[in-house]
Every structure is written in C-alpha cells, then in structure tokens.
Amino acid sequence: QMLPLYGYTAVVIYKDELYVAAMYTDENDKWDPAHYNTRNLHKLVKRVQKDLPDNRLVEHLGNCSLTWHCCTAQNLFYRRWEAGIPSSPVCNANCFGCISLQPAECCPSPQSRIKFRPTPKEIAQIGIYHLETAPDAIISFGQGCEGEPSLAVDNIVPAIEKIRKKYPPTYMNLKII
C-alpha cells in the first residue's frame, strides 16, 4: 500500500530512548500537537455548524478538522489563532507532490481538495465569525486543501472588503504558489 504525502522520518530505539532524524526548528507553541485533536473537537464543530448552518465552508472545514486533522481548520472551531479559509478548487501550478490532488495511479493525497467555489458571503461569514472572538486572530487563504487562491480573487476580494468594513485592522494572509 502506498503511503500518503505526509512528512516522514526514520525512528530508532537506542538504550530505551526514541531518536529521530530531525531537528527542532520552531518554538511557536501555537502549533504544538497537544493543542489539537482534543476530545471536545467534535462538539466544537457541531457548535459552529449550528451557528453558521448554511455555510458550505463550515462543512468542508469540519471534515478537514476531523478527517485530515488540519490545524488551521481546527483553529476555526477552537476560535483561536490562524484559521484557514479555502477558496479555490482549481490550480494552475501542477506541483509534483501536491498534497490535495494526485493522479489516480500515484500515492494517495493526504487531504482532499475543496470541491466547490465558496461565495464571497460564505468567505466573509467565516472570516468575521473567527475574528469576533479569536485571540491573535489571523485568517488565511492558500491552504493545503485548495488549489491556487489567486484564481479565486473575484470571490476573495469582495469577501475581504466585507471583513475590512467590520474589522479594519485585521491580519490576513494569502499564500500563493
């Protein structure tokens, strides 16, 4: 069976200790795995589904959180830090090793790409919802579960305009390929 495109490393037990071929490079506690996949995550996803019942992004991000264990998706439901807002189902980069779309004969993708194009209203609704209460809030476009966000600017720009009307001094991040 082919392994999905996750990060892997060698592990060895030596004198009852685990050793890995890796180097610790980031001291940002916000991405510590202990903060994610908690027992109450299902309940938090259901709460946001109830708060935003007609928003397709909530369903998509709930799946990203519960199936693929995506940290930026989970942050929406935990109402903290950086929350990703996938916006583009298409891409023009054709990256070797794309984590959201692989040819059928290749290895499985570690997450599934968004299959719809969110409306400006859906994007703005998620952004505003997150910014209302999240400490150190950031909203970002260009997640692993989407294509190239710059191909969705006709939906992202009006959404950002709505968000900026309510939250002018806001951190937004656009990751382009």
Where is each model-derived feature located?
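Short acidic, gly/pro-rich beta-turn/loop elements at beta-sheet edges
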Residues: 21, 95, 151
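Core AdoMet radical
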Residues: 82, 86, 102-177
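Short cysteine clusters
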Residues: 91, 95-98, 141
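N-terminal [4Fe-4S]-dependent radical SAM core
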Residues: 6-85, 102-110, 122, 129
